[in-house]
Amino acid sequence: MIPQSVRRVVAAAPQSPVVSSLAASSAPRAGASYILSSYQPNALQKRRYSSSKPSSPDDGSSRAFAARASVPAAGTSKTPGEKRKRKAKEPVMPPLPSVPSTRHIKDEALALSTFFALHRPISVTQLLPKTVTEESFAEIFNHRKGHKATDVLSTLSQAVHDLESPMSGLRLSDNDVEDGSTKISLKHPDGTESDVYFQLNSMSGHFLPFNPPPPPEPIAEVDEAAAEAEASAAIAEEIAATAEQEPETRVYKAVVTIEETRDTNGQYKIMAHSPQLVEDDAVQPRSFLERLALRQIRYEEARQQQGIMHAISVRRQKKLKIKKKKYKKLMRRTRNERRKQDRL
């Protein structure tokens, strides 16, 4: 018996009319031989599991794979012109900004520079503050050497030439001479014109020639004992002057204690104790510093009289809070009864 799957394959195969008419007599034999030759029971039982390797024929040869690989894929070949166009279309990204490395600088030296970098982005490449040697500091106060006259003349002529070359293309108006200001008309590359007014006389005073500062002079050494004596004398003079200007007044209170005793006979005995002078505190200090010192003294005395404060645990705090809450509820509940008792 022929399997049903083989019959479907034979029925689906296309047949030309010429070949079918010529081989009409040999059709049964050819069909039987074709069916028998194409039918292989072992081929139906084989099953290839999915893998990344390409399929290979049953006999183990790799001719089909070699032939398949040798055939060029249609539509994959591209001309070099297309590749060039694609490369040209890709946008060219500008190089990213880079900062010089600071690995050679210690972290302690970069602390101040990092603080300034928080407010403004800067590239730190050296220590801050920069170390200055004594020689470079002394060069600031050294007088410059005299230059030759030829060098001075060449420098001045070059400066005049640099100033006259851009001013030659500028146009000056005659109306500005009366006002004392000079008008310069500038023409920008884009074709627009703008006028600039400035006064040479007022600007000349802002640009002064450089003059080196005088060299520093050492401070004269003074004896400490003499300085202390002068300071104490000045303080004594100030105290005496203030005492003369504002007379100092003090108020004292005298408290007399009288003790009265009674004997068994009914006689009274009176004894007076000697008074004690007590300065009156009613006089308020006049200056702000005196009042501030008095308040500080009173604060310290009150703080010492309060005693020591002891901390309690969280459990006791919660317990006290619950007691207060219960007491409030009790008072709220017995409010009417208490009011009635007060009325009676």
From Swiss-Prot:
Disulfide bridge positions per record: none
InterPro entries per record: Ribosomal_mS38_C (IPR013177)
One GO CC term on file: mitochondrion
Region (Disordered): 1-27, 43-101, 325-344
Subcellular location: Mitochondrion
GO annotation (BP), single: positive regulation of proteolysis
Keywords: Mitochondrion
Main location: mitochondrion
Biased composition (Basic residues): 325-338
Ranges of compositional bias, category Low complexity: 51-74
Stated name of the protein: Small ribosomal subunit protein mS38
Organism annotation: Neurospora crassa (strain ATCC 24698 / 74-OR23-1A / CBS 708.71 / DSM 1257 / FGSC 987)
